[in-house]
C-alpha cells in the first residue's frame, strides 16, 4: 500500500508559515527581569502550517503542490528557498502583510516563550483572492486530491473554500479539510474534514466527551447539517473515529510517550490525503502503521 502512495500529486491550499527555533541552555536568571537567560547554541527553520502538510506529503513519497500567500520580506524569501531546496512545487503570492512566523525559544529542552509575527484577521482583496483561485484551477487537472489547510490566517475564506470545493467536485477530485473555527458553512459539501475533539464540540454546540457514542452522534449531526461525505475525528490517546452515513469505524492508536504534539494534525491530514489519493479505503488506513 505504501508503494501505491508514491508519486501521487496533492494540491495543498492554505496558510503557510515559518517556524523558527532558537535552542540553547539556561544557567541563570536575568538581572533585568525574573526570566531565564537562554544562551542560544543553535537556530533553525522549519516549514509550518499548510507548508508542513506539504512537507509531510513529500516524506510519504507524494508530490505536493502548494498555493498560498507570503509576505514580501526576508522570512518569505527564506520559505521560498526552503520550498526550492525540497523540490516542492508552489504558487506563492506576495501580500503587503508580513510572512506568518512562529519563533520558539527552547532552553534546557523546555519551551521558554513563543513569539508570533502575523497580522490579525488578514482579509483577502479581490485581486489576491482571484490569483489564488486561478492557481488552484490551473493545478486541478493534474492532481489526484486536494487539501485545504485552514489555520484561520486569511487564505481559506468562505469564497476560496467554496470555489475550491466546487471546482474540485467538477473534476471528480476529493477535498480534505483541516478545519479552523466554527464557521463550517464555508466547508459545505467537502469530502472529509478532520476536526479534533475540541473542534467537534465547538462546531456541534455540544459538550462532546471522548466516548464513541457521543462522538458519533455529534459527527452525524454535522454531516447532515453541512452535506459532508465524512468526518475523521482525532481523539488524542483514543485514536480516531471515522464517521460516514454508510460506514463508521473507531481506529485505536498505540500508546507512546509524546514530547511535542505540534504538527500532529498536519501529519494526519497528509497521511489521509496520500492514502485516499492512492485509492486506499478509509477502513484500511492504519495511521500508526503508515
Where in the sequence are the language-model features?
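Positively charged, low-complexity intrinsically disordered leader regions
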Residues: 1-27
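Short pre-catalytic strand/loop immediately N-terminal to key active-site residues, enriched for Gly-Thr
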Residues: 41-45, 252-262
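Conserved phosphate/ATP/ADP-binding segment of small-molecule kinases
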Residues: 153-248
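Substrate-binding N-lobe of the ribokinase-like
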Residues: 8, 31, 35-101
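Conserved small/polar residues in nucleotide/adenosyl-binding loops
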Residues: 288-289
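Short acidic, glycine-rich surface-loop motifs adjacent to enzyme active sites
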Residues: 143-155
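Structural motif
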Residues: 11-13, 114, 145-147, 176, ...
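Conserved phosphate-binding/catalytic loop of the ribokinase/pfkB sugar-kinase fold
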Residues: 91-97, 104-140
Amino acid at each position: 500500500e505504501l508503494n501505491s502512495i508514491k508519486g501521487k500529486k496533492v494540491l495543498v491550499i492554505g496558510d503557510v508559515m515559518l517556524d523558527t527555533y532558537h535552542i540553547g541552555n539556561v544557567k541563570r536568571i536575568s538581572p533585568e527581569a525574573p526570566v531565564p537567560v537562554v544562551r542560544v547554541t543553535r537556530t533553525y527553520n522549519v516549514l509550518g502550517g499548510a507548508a508542513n502538510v506539504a512537507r509531510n506529503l513529500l516524506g510519504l513519497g507524494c508530490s505536493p503542490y502548494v498555493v498560498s500567500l507570503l509576505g514580501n520580506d526576508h522570512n518569505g524569501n527564506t520559505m521560498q528557498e526552503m520550498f526550492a531546496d525540497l523540490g516542492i512545487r508552489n504558487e506563492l503570492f506576495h501580500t503587503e502583510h508580513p510572512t506568518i512566523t512562529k519563533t520558539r525559544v527552547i532552553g534546557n529542552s523546555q519551551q521558554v516563550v513563543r513569539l508570533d509575527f502575523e497580522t490579525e484577521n488578514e482579509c483577502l482583496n479581490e485581486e489576491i483572492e482571484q490569483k489564488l483561485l486561478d492557481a488552484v484551477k490551473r493545478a486541478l487537472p493534474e492532481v489526484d486530491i486536494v487539501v485545504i489547510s485552514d489555520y484561520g490566517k486569511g487564505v481559506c475564506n468562505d469564497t476560496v473554500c467554496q470555489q475550491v470545493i466546487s471546482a474540485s467536485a467538477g473534476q471528480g477530485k476529493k477535498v480534505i479539510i483541516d478545519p479552523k473555527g466554527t464557521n463550517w458553512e464555508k466547508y459545505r459539501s467537502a469530502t472529509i474534514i478532520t476536526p479534533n475533539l475540541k473542534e467537534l464540540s465547538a462546531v456541534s454546540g455540544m459538550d462532546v466527551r471522548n466516548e464513541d457514542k457521543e462522538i458519533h452522534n455529534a459527527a452525524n449531526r454535522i454531516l447532515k447539517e453541512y452535506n459532508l461525505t465524512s468526518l475523521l475525528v482525532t481523539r488524542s490517546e483514543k485514536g480516531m473515529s471515522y464517521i460516514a452515513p454508510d460506514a463508521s469505524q473507531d481506529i485505536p492508536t498505540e500508546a507512546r510517550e509524546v514530547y511535542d504534539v505540534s504538527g500532529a494534525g498536519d501529519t494526519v491530514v497528509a497521511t489521509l490525503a496520500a492514502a485516499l489519493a492512492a485509492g486506499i479505503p478509509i477502513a484500511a488506513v492504519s495511521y500508526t502503521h503508515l
